[in-house]
């Protein structure tokens, strides 16, 4: 019995040893087993051990090679015959896919052949690997510009890669993770880097997110917003940098880069889209801006308007701006009246009266790395003497209160002069170029002007008010006649619409509410709110808006700016022959609705100090 058991154990051990020697044989690079003859001969030379000495632990069976062979056979049988693009490299290897005769292949593309660069170590998770978890695979090196099409791409490599990526997507090595952005062409990647989303708010609180280029200027962004909002581009739209916590705001210059300005703004700050008619008013009327006592050059010589403008833009002969300002002391709530001098090098204050000697001047703020802002509510937030405050703020995101230089002028005209002087001394000729760009665009080209047709050249203005028609030679009279004809056409069309419609509104009722569709009518706002809107959109002559009267429910108020001062005129209703009219001069001139009143005073001065030129507008983005 014991002999039978020993004989069966010996036969089992011999079979296990033969199987382990076969499975654990090392693989060569070509996938063949190493020769075991040396091991067999050495084992024959040694004396055989007893059955108990031959008893060994069971060795793990490496199934990687077997799985590779099965997978290779399965894929070869399941896939159609794919032409091998490199028969000279893989044709002699065992287990290679079936090759196709060269005559059956399509003509090769005109590209240089690929080169084989040998083995490389690649991380493939989730596989039975040896040692450090790396597996030796073959890699092909293609020349620059070579692309793998569906015809030349090896099908087995594509399927294997897809199987690995679907099997273990979470444990994939970071070195093998492919970023989809990295596969994009260089031009598309540059476009992604050069674009940024910017959020812009309007006066009514609405906002719009606009994708812009990183080098887009404030002028270009304003033109883009005008196009998207369907507004009239009259070169008066601006982008406003608004800081609600600090109570500061300023209009960006047309040449400033929007992304660069946004990088210096804190998170709570924002951009506003607003009109500013006074942005380049200085270049139109420079003498009206600076009184003689404020400009040092005016005290030394008697120059005209052109000479004053030239001296402001000239870097060598730039005048000094001087005068008294209220300056907030650093670290205190008190304000102190100081004699201040603004030069191209910076803003200085005198420690001894009005002396401008170098030993008496102290630097208050630098112009290069700073910007000047309007104080929105300086009297409430900073205890300023009045509401004509300014602030010089460094151009950085995190600004402490001790770095702000708070100033306050006596009135609005003095504040406008200081703000304009700061911009002129900082930007100089660049500011004048921004002013000239829209004017150059508006001029017709010298040689490419479109030719008018014969029928257009033969048209003339005619007056048919009398019994005999006459030709209007005066251009001003022709324009006035065209406006009158437009008003008459509007009245006729309104009357026809009322007669043809089933609306129960009486014509007088329609005339009483038709003005609410106009941009210059702002509804029920207070006097302070109307003044604030006028100041925000520029204190220029002729800037106006209409609103409901707070004292008389049936009346309206015309708010008008003249000589940088805001005035209010009441529009009262009056009745004549049972019909309601509106008048601004106690019934001397009557209008059936407010639209006719505004149209009339845009052409005629009348009892107003100036004509109506610009209206305040709020646009919803």
From Swiss-Prot:
SMART domains reported in the protein's UniProt record: PH, RA, SH2
- Residue ranges of every copy of the PH domain listed in the record: 318-427
Q: Name one Pfam family in it.
A: SH2
> Would you kindly state one Gene Ontology biological process term found in this protein's UniProt entry?
negative regulation of glycogen biosynthetic process
Q: Which SUPFAM superfamilies match?
A: PH domain-like, SH2 domain, Ubiquitin-like
The record's PANTHER family line, in alphabetical order, gives: GROWTH FACTOR RECEPTOR-BOUND PROTEIN, GROWTH FACTOR RECEPTOR-BOUND PROTEIN 10
What does the comment on domains in this protein's record state?
Answer: The PH domain binds relatively non-specifically to several phosphoinositides, including PI(5)P, PI(4,5)P2, PI(3,4)P2 and PI(3,4,5)P3, with modest affinities.
Q: In its UniProt entry, what is this protein called?
A: Growth factor receptor-bound protein 10
Organism the protein comes from: Mus musculus
- GN (gene name): Grb10
């Amino acid at each position: 019995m014991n002999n039978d058991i020993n004989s069966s154990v010996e036969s089992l051990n011999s079979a296990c040893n033969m199987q382990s020697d076969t499975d654990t044989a090392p693989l060569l690079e070509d996938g063949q087993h190493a020769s075991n003859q040396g091991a067999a001969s050495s084992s024959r030379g040694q004396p055989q051990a007893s059955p108990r000495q031959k008893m060994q632990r069971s060795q793990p069976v490496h199934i990687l090679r077997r799985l590779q062979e099965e997978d290779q056979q399965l894929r070869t049988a399941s896939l159609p015959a794919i032409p091998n693009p490199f028969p000279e490299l893989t044709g002699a290897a065992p287990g290679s896919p079936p090759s196709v005769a060269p005559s059956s292949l399509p003509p090769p593309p005109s590209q240089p052949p690929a080169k084989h660069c040998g083995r490389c170590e690649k991380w493939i998770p989730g596989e039975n690997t040896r040692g450090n978890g790396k597996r030796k695979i073959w890699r092909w090196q293609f020349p620059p510009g070579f692309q793998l099409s569906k015809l030349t791409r090896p099908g087995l490599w594509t399927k294997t890669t897809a199987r690995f990526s679907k099997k273990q997507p979470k444990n994939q090595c970071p070195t093998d993770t492919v970023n989809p952005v990295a596969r994009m062409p260089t031009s598309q990647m540059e476009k992604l880097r050069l674009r940024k989303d910017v959020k812009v708010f309007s006066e009514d609180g609405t906002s719009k997110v606009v994708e812009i280029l990183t080098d887009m200027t404030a002028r270009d962004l304003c033109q883009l917003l005008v196009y998207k909002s369907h507004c009239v581009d009259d070169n008066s739209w601006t982008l406003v940098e608004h800081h609600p916590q600090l109570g500061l705001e300023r209009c960006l210059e047309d040449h400033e880069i929007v992304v660069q300005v946004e990088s210096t703004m804190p998170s709570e700050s924002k951009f506003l889209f607003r009109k500013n008619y006074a942005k380049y008013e200085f270049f139109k009327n420079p003498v009206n801006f600076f009184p003689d006592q404020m400009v040092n050059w005016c005290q030394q010589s008697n120059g005209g308007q052109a000479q004053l403008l030239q001296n402001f833009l000239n870097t060598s002969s730039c005048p000094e701006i001087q005068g008294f300002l209220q300056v907030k002391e650093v670290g205190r709530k008190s304000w102190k009246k100081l004699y201040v001098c603004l030069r191209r090098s910076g803003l200085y204050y005198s420690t001894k009266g009005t002396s401008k000697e170098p030993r008496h001047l102290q630097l208050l703020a630098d112009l290069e790395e700073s910007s000047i802002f309007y104080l929105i509510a300086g009297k409430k937030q900073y205890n300023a003497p009045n509401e004509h405050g300014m602030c010089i703020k460094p151009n950085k995101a995190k600004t402490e209160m001790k770095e702000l230089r708070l100033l306050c002028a006596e009135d609005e005209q003095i504040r406008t002069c200081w703000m304009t002087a700061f911009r002129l001394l900082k930007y100089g000729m660049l500011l004048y170029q921004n002013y000239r760009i829209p004017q150059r665009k508006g001029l017709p080209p010298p040689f490419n002007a479109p030719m008018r047709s014969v029928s257009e050249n033969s048209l003339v203005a005619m007056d048919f008010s009398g019994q005999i028609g006459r030709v209007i030679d005066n251009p001003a009279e022709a324009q006035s006649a065209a406006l009158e004809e437009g008003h008459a056409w509007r009245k006729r069309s309104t009357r026809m619409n009322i007669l043809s419609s089933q609306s129960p509104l009486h014509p007088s009722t329609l005339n009483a509410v038709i003005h609410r569709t106009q941009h210059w009518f702002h509804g029920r706002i207070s006097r302070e709110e109307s003044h604030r809107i006028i100041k925000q959109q520029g204190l220029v002559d002729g800037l106006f808006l209409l609103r409901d009267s707070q004292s008389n429910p049936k009346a309206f108020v015309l708010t008008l700016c003249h000589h940088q001062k805001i005035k209010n005129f009441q529009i009262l209703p009056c009745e004549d022959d049972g019909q309601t009219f509106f008048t601004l001069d106690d019934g001397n001139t009557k209008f059936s609705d407010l639209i006719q009143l505004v149209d009339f005073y845009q052409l005629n001065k009348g009892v107003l100090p100036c004509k109506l030129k610009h209206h305040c507008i709020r646009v919803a983005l």
